[in-house]
Amino acid sequence: MGAARLLPNLTLCLQLLILCCQTQGENHPSPNFNQYVRDQGAMTDQLSRRQIREYQLYSRTSGKHVQVTGRRISATAEDGNKFAKLIVETDTFGSRVRIKGAESEKYICMNKRGKLIGKPSGKSKDCVFTEIVLENNYTAFQNARHEGWFMAFTRQGRPRQASRSRQNQREAHFIKRLYQGQLPFPNHAERQKQFEFVGSAPTRRTKRTRRPQSQT
């Protein structure tokens, strides 16, 4: 009799315990992985091995390639120019990179006035850019320190004021191209002679003698 009376009470206690555990589980927030990715993407990754790529950046506006000739950055280099070869290092496991000229060994950075300059060290945040792949298959580069400021060039290949640049503007659009070095016969004035044909002395044309017509 006593055990039969205790059985309903034990069942009720067990149900209350299960309900309490379910309530605590519902109140505990699930981890936000998207926020975790954003937070980690904003930090420099010191643990993972950095990925290094080499390519050229073709400017949509100038029709030339970005080159680093020291402190000066421009988009006036021809295809295969040694100063147009860029070494791109990943900064995080996301899409942030550091861009360095292979020949000059200077990093592309952006100062507080929004001007592109070359620096020997790329450790500061103003030398980090976020790659943004656009719908038109072009790529834009937003500075990590100055959000909303993009790498951009004018039609003449001069750097444009970053504070006036926007992601949807042609001046901020680039295409990644493989670096294959200079062409064997570049279109240069002093090397035009390599395309000339070997001349030969003109030959005389012999006159064709006509046979006298027979008179009938």
From Swiss-Prot:
Sites carrying sugar chains: N137
Biased composition (Basic residues): 204-216
UniProt region (Disordered), positions on chain: 195-216
CDD domains to which the protein is assigned, alphabetical: beta-trefoil_FGF17
Coiled-coil residue windows: none
Tissue: Expressed in embryonic brain, mostly in the isthmus cerebellar neuroepithelium and septum neuroepithelium, and in all adult tissues.
Pfam families linked: FGF
Location relative to the cell: Secreted
GO cellular component: cytoplasm; extracellular space
GO biological process, one term: regulation of cell migration
Signal sequence coordinates: 1-22
Alphabetized UniProt keyword annotations: Developmental protein, Glycoprotein, Growth factor, Secreted, Signal
Origin: domain of life: Eukaryota
Main location: secreted
Gene3D superfamilies associated with the record: 2.80.10.50
A GO molecular-function descriptor: type 2 fibroblast growth factor receptor binding
UniProt xrefs under PANTHER family: FIBROBLAST GROWTH FACTOR (PTHR11486)
Family: Belongs to the heparin-binding growth factors family.
Function noted in UniProt: Plays an important role in the regulation of embryonic development and as signaling molecule in the induction and patterning of the embryonic brain. Required for normal brain development.
Subunit text: Interacts with FGFR3 and FGFR4.
Name this protein carries in UniProt: Fibroblast growth factor 17
